[in-house]
A protein has these predicted regions:
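Type IV pilin-like appendage domain
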Residues: 69-145, 201, 212
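Short, acidic, Ser/Thr-enriched surface-loop or helix-capping motifs
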Residues: 8, 109, 185
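Cell-surface, membrane-associated systems
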Residues: 118, 137-212
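Conserved RecA-like P-loop NTPase ATPase core
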Residues: 35, 58, 146
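Juxtamembrane interface helices immediately C-terminal to a transmembrane segment
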Residues: 36-47, 63
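N-terminal single-pass transmembrane signal-anchor helix
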Residues: 1-40, 54
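Alpha-helix exit/C-cap motif
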Residues: 45, 53-79
């Protein structure tokens, strides 16, 4: 007598496949927004950290050289300005769009602006921040200077760094949660804080006063 043995199929049934796809869709629906938020928070942290490093370096250099050292938002054809090429393209942006990068220089002639290489000394150039980042100074003049004592050569400064959402809005709850502020006291010391405000209270630059 011949015995016929049945062999189980090695694949999935249609029902099993549909269930697996549905489960994958659920996982992705939670994972993608979380990953997107993680990336945006990393952008904010990276931008703030770079700014603080350069800010502290400028302050130290001012005390070392006993001259004013200025950091200003990059303007003009910024892509042709680097730390080794102090050309006419290395100019400050008086509109204060710090997300385009910034320039640090020794203000030898004391005019607050980056002059020719024979006059002022360029210390460094930071490239533009990641796409979607908005980094502005509350005063809007686009520069901050330290004197020979490491203190501010001017009034206190506040900087706001915001990460826009996919729709480009800047005042919803998520954007405020990702916002970071840098307050520079007259002593030259910088402090980072987070936004403490309800949705809708931020301006287009998300300048929100942190809670005391």
């Amino acid at each position: 007598m011949t015995i016929v043995r049945s062999r189980a199929g090695g694949g999935f049934t249609l029902v099993e496949l549909l269930v697996a796809i549905a489960m994958l869709a659920i996982v992705v629906s939670f994972a993608v927004p979380a990953y997107s938020d993680f990336v945006m928070r990393k952008r904010a942290s990276s931008g703030i950290n770079d700014f603080l490093v350069d800010l502290n370096a400028a302050r130290s250099e001012a005390t070392r050289q006993r001259r004013n050292v200025v950091m200003c938002a990059r303007g003009g054809a910024a892509e042709t300005c680097d730390a080794t090429t102090q050309s006419a393209a290395c100019i400050c942006d008086d509109q204060g769009q710090w997300e385009n990068g910034w320039i640090t220089f020794v203000d030898i002639n004391g005019d607050g602006a980056l002059s020719a290489a024979s006059i002022d000394a360029l210390l460094g150039v930071h490239p533009a921040l990641a796409s979607g980042v908005r980094f502005r100074e509350a005063s809007g003049d686009g520069s901050i200077a330290f004197n020979s004592r490491g203190a501010l050569a001017g009034t206190v400064s506040r900087f706001a760094l915001c990460i826009n959402d996919d729709a480009g809005t800047q005042d919803d709850e998520d954007v405020l949660a990702r916002a970071r502020f840098v307050d520079v006291a007259l002593t030259g010391r910088a402090v980072v804080s987070r936004a403490q405000a309800s949705p809708g209270s931020a301006s287009s630059a998300c300048y929100v006063s942190p809670s005391s």
